């Protein structure tokens, strides 16, 4: 598997050759397909080296990273056409892909931590370098400080873990039992902020609103999943305390998900609405992981993959409108069925997937999470009813406001959509719905 890492690394010199944008794009898709074909060879645990290896969970998230990074280049046609440092832009995407590959395949907690934090740097460069408004500086500061405030305590905890157990190697780590309550809090907080959990989520809508399309895609598609993956990995170290105190995180995330759903009703910014809906979906993932049962972990896994494809597709749709009308406001982006009738079909398909209707992967994930959380506490159905219902309400609100009604009077006409854009949307939607037919993949 080290060969894939080398192949990505050798794409970097191509970035600085003249007019190699689409060559790199094609090679990244080729790499994604080759990686996908090799799945059955690496379905079980597989070692790359002493510090690197991956299992079922990390393999799928690496594949998602390959796929989303390839689609980021497809979506960023405007960067290529404007020639605004397009070579450096592709270099950042490849560097980010290497960081994600190393994060998901790390078997050592310290190397996982280093690559986990390193993925922040290229994301920040994407927001600051190719964002649209001057407020992107504030969004970048939010992103850095929210993430780093919880990361320093996590580093100190890792040093203490090494002192106690003399190793940071995942398979050899043991449960610390009833000691070190602060271990439990500090170890979870860095990952919960990354997901993000309600109350520490304010950086996400800001980052989404100010980020270019590529930044929003990788942020919603993969970087949020780093938090869930981290919780999944460290759960066994603190499972004893988790049995006692996880109810707090479950309650907070589920109630927070309902509150965030209400916040979605008040949004008039399209990207902000999709960003807040990510927080609502991730609240169910946190709830499922914290129950620490098989249904919860597998449901979180499938919802993370489904949400990564679905929210990335929705950001692509909002960007397609933004490139034509120059606004993200729902007050201006209305009646789009009159201007772009073919694109309305894609809005409907992604909106229906976002509210977890069949045959999307989100449905499979949400059903598993409902099963998991209800088996943990029957009374949680009171919150889950509202969470599932309002998820459909704000998605339909977004769809109906943006597509129906009279269009903005100052807009006379616009392009119906390029082949590149429809191709991009198809490559998001197809795996999102076809994977539902391969349900056993997520429940081994």
Regions found by a protein language model. Name each.
Residues 1-444:
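Core, highly hydrophobic multi-pass alpha-helical transmembrane subunits of bioenergetic inner membranes
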């Amino acid at each position: 598997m080290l060969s894939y890492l080398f192949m990505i690394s050798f794409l970097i010199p191509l970035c600085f050759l003249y007019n190699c944008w689409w060559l790199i794009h094609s090679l990244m898709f080729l790499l994604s397909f080759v990686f996908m074909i090799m799945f059955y060879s690496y379905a079980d645990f597989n070692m790359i080296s002493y510090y690197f290896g991956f299992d079922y969970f990390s393999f799928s998230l690496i594949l998602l990273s390959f796929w989303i990074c390839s689609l980021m280049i497809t979506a960023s046609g405007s960067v290529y056409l404007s020639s605004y440092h397009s070579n450096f832009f592709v270099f950042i995407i490849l560097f980010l892909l290497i960081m994600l590959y190393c994060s998901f395949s790390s078997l050592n907690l310290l190397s996982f931590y280093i690559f986990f934090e390193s993925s922040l740097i290229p994301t920040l460069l994407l927001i600051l370098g190719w964002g649209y408004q001057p407020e992107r500086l504030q969004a970048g500061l939010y992103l850095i400080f929210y993430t780093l405030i919880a990361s320093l305590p996590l580093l100190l905890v890792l040093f203490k873990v090494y002192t106690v157990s003399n190793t940071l190697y995942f398979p050899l780590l043991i449960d610390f039992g009833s000691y070190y309550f602060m271990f439990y809090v500090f170890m979870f907080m860095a990952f919960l902020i990354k997901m993000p959990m309600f109350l520490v989520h304010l950086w996400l809508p800001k980052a989404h609103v100010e980020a270019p399309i590529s930044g929003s895609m990788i942020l919603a598609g993969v970087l949020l999943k780093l938090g869930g993956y981290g919780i999944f990995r460290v759960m066994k170290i603190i499972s004893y305390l988790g049995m006692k105190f996880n109810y707090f995180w479950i309650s907070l995330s589920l109630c927070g998900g309902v509150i965030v759903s209400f916040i979605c009703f008040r949004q008039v910014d399209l990207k902000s609405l999709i960003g807040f809906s990510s927080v609502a979906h991730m609240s169910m993932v946190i709830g499922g992981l914290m129950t620490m049962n098989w249904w919860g972990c597998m449901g979180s896994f499938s919802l993370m993959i489904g949400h990564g494809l679905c929210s990335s597709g929705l950001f692509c749709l909002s960007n397609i409108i933004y490139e034509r009308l120059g606004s993200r406001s729902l007050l201006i982006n209305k009646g789009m069925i009159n201007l772009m009738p073919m694109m309305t079909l894609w809005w409907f398909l992604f909106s229906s997937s976002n509210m977890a209707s069949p045959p999307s992967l989100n449905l499979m994930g949400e059903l598993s999470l409902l099963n998991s959380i209800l088996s943990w506490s029957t009374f949680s159905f009171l919150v889950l009813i509202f969470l599932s219902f309002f998820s459909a309400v704000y998605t339909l609100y977004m769809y109906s406001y943006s597509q129906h009604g009279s269009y903005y009077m100052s807009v006379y006409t616009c392009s119906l959509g390029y082949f590149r854009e429809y191709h991009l949307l198809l490559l998001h939607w197809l795996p999102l719905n076809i994977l539902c037919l391969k349900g056993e993949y997520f429940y081994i």
